[in-house]
Every structure is written in structure tokens, then in C-alpha cells.
Amino acid sequence: MKYRFAVALGLAVVMASGTSAQEKELVFGVTEGVTYQATPKEIRDKFTPLAEYVGKATGRRVKIVLVPAYNDVRAGMAKHEYDLVFIHPAHVAMAEVKGGRYKAVAWTSGFTDYTVSLLINPEGTLKSLDDLKGRTLVTPDPDSITAMMVRAMLRTGKLPMTTAKPDAQNAKEMEGSVRVISTRYQDAVPFYIENGFAQAGATAAKSVVKSWTDKGGKVLAQSRAVPIKQLLVSSALPADEQERIRAALLGIGQSKPGKDALDAIGYKGFVATNPEVEAATIAWLGL
């Protein structure tokens, strides 16, 4: 009888220990941009020091989960699979904020004013967004934040959009619409303009814009600014834990481990979110 009691007690202790260890683990999802090229190892190496820093600040082990596909991170957040998540594309992050499933606790310093530039050839006749009617505009991946912002620009300008190929049946419709095509990466956009596949191209990569303008290319228009690379916490986390994570991120530059994490990730730091900007951006993107 005593032996059975001891065995049962031992099993209970093991199970309780396992539960305690599981409760201490924070799942940190990481979703980078789809239009930039980086390997999973490069991304994990970048974020590991940040995960360790958050772990020390919260007293919990942090497990990194790389989620490259936007639809996968959407599905995961719908089920609160991540306690903390870093998301490059603002439209994916802010859809979760609007839905109440997650809260933005910090934005990445230097990435709160992400803008899209529409590139055109210097010898072209385009002078305004309205001149894009009947023309072709190339964007990066359709589910990228860049493409999402382009659609918001056109929608704000009351410009009809289409992805259809021109033919005899839709010729009249095409004349009054902007035909939008896509390529995977931002740095491929200039190729489409230079080779006549599109009359304008959208990019948010400053290096691409600089290279284009340095050789005489022009910028037709620039979008409003949007904060990208957001850090969100699950609304299912206790409020005090949400606050510990927020405070740790905002104060990351005040300690050596924090500075080391910033060096590894390549960012200057994190800043407080702005509810007014957040609400305005959600509305502009049509989320």
C-alpha cells in the first residue's frame, strides 16, 4: 500500500514538474518579409539573442518558431499558438490587432515610416496616379505589405484595379483600370519597367529606389507611412506578463544583453506603439 502511494506520489510530482516547465515556456513566432531573401538559419541566428533577452526579463524559457508563410502565421495566431510574435508585414499584424487576438507592444525603431515608391522611366509621360489608367503596374508578392499598400493607394485615388490580361473583350474596361501584375522580390521590379513589361513599379526597398533614381529614373508617387516589423503579444497572456514583455522590449538598449541582442538582430531598438496611427493604418489598409 505504501509502495503504491509512493509511486503515485512520484508520478504526480513528475507530472506537476512537466506542467510547470511547460507553463514557463513562451513561444516566440517570427515572420519576416516574403519579398526579401534570407535563409531560415540567418533568421534564427538573428532572433535567438532577442529570445534569450526576453526569457531573462520574464523568467521563462523562450522557444523560437519560424513561420515564413503569412497564411501559416495567420492560422497560428487564430489559435493563439504564439505568446509573442515578430511580424514584418503590417497588414498581417494589424488584422490580428483589429480582431482582438493580439496586441502590439512595440514597433521596431527605424521602421515606423515604411513607404512605397512607384518607379517610372524618366522619358515616360506619367505625371500622376490618375495617369496609371490603362497602364501596367508591377508590385512584389500580392500578399506583401508593399502590394497591400499599393492597393490602398489606388483605392484612395479611386482608381479601378484589375489583374486580367488585356484582350478584345475587356479592352474598354482595361482603358479605365490599372492592371496590376506581380513578381516575387522587390529588387526584380526595375527589370519589369526597363524591359517594357510594366510602365510603373512599386517598391519599398530604399536601396532599390536609390539605385533607380541614381541612374536617372523617377518616382511617380510615394505612399503614406506605415509601421512594419511589429512585436505582438497574445491577448490570452496575463496582463502583467504582457507588461513585462513590453517594458523589456522598450528598455532593451539599457543593458549589455539587450544591446547584444540589438546588434545580432540589426535594429536600433524598439519604440512604443501609437494607437492613433494604428487605427488610421488599419482603416487605410482596408482591414
PLM feature spans:
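Acidic, polar ligand-binding/catalytic clefts
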Residues: 67-131, 143-145, 156
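Bilobed "Venus flytrap"/periplasmic-binding protein-like clamshell domains
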Residues: 31-55, 90, 114-191, 195
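Extracytoplasmic small-molecule ligand-binding "clamshell" domains
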Residues: 22-93
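Short helices/loops that flank or line small-molecule/ion binding pockets
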Residues: 71-85, 98, 171-174, 179-198, ...
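Bacterial N-terminal signal peptides
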Residues: 6-16
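Periplasmic-binding protein-like
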Residues: 24, 30-34, 110-120, 173-174, ...
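Sec/Tat signal peptide C-region and signal peptidase I cleavage site
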Residues: 17-21
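A ligand-binding cleft/hinge motif common to bilobed small-molecule-binding domains
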Residues: 89-99, 151-157, 190-219
